[in-house]
Each structure stands twice: as structure tokens, then as C-alpha cells.
Amino acid sequence: MAKPVKAPRARVCIDRVLPRDMMRLQPTSRRAGRVRAIAPVGKTWMNGSTLRVRFLGGTAAQHRIVKEQAGWWAEHSNLRFEFVQASDAEIRISFDPDDGAWSYVGTDCRGIPANEATMNLGFMDGGTTAHEFGHAIGLAHEHQNPAGGIEWNEEAVIREWAS
């Protein structure tokens, strides 16, 4: 008898937005046209901050990828990342393949108990790691900005995600 084939799991970023912050997004750009990045009010780290990053498991190969991708953000932002074993690190990364890919947004990490992850990298294909680090430094999805200029075909979106 043939073994049943499992349908592939959808790989999406799961928002970790605290309830009090829903719908308080603010664009980081004031230029006309589409906004490329947004930061929820009060979620970005202080300019020049060094954010400590701790791994909660994972392999040496996974750690290497994370460090490379964090380095990209360090080059393009006014933030630095220090990889430590300290339990009170601001960013704590787990690698649970059953929990998807997600990150709390920016300074929300401060309110998460020190023994819990603030980011999970259940898969690391494509730009997933860099994407989640964008959230960790305080950026949200640009489509969440009401002024972002995206015209949704709501019926098509619902149909796509309902199947």
C-alpha cells in the first residue's frame, strides 16, 4: 500500500503583535508613493544600540546563517548585534520546525519572559532569517500600513488562504 503524501505546509511569517498595539502603525517614510517599511509606534530600538542575541538550541550551521543575516541589518541600520549566552539577551532565537517563522516586533522583546524565545526560525529558506530580524529591530509588514498604497483584492486573498 502506498504511503500517503503529506501536503506541504505553508511557510508564512506569523505576526507577534501585542494586543495593545494593534492598528498603531506609523510609516518610517514621509515621501509620496508606497511606503517600503513601517515601524509600529515606540517599537524601534534606540539609535546606536547593541542588541544581545542568544540561541535557544539550533545547529552550528543555523547559527552561522543567523549571524550572516544579522550582519546585513547591522550594515543597513544604526544597530549592532552581539551573540551571547546571557539569559537576559534582548533577542532569543529558537529553531522549532513545528512553530513556523516569527518574531516579536522590536522593543516588545523586553516584555517577554527571559526563558522564552522572542524569535523562532522553524525554517530558514530564502530571506526568512533577514525578514524576521527586520521584525526584531522594530519593523512591521509594509502591507499593514493603511497608507501603504496596496490595493487588495480581498475576495482573492480569502479564496487563496481558505484552500
Q: How would you label these PLM feature ranges?
A:
Residues 1-163:
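Zinc-dependent metalloendopeptidases
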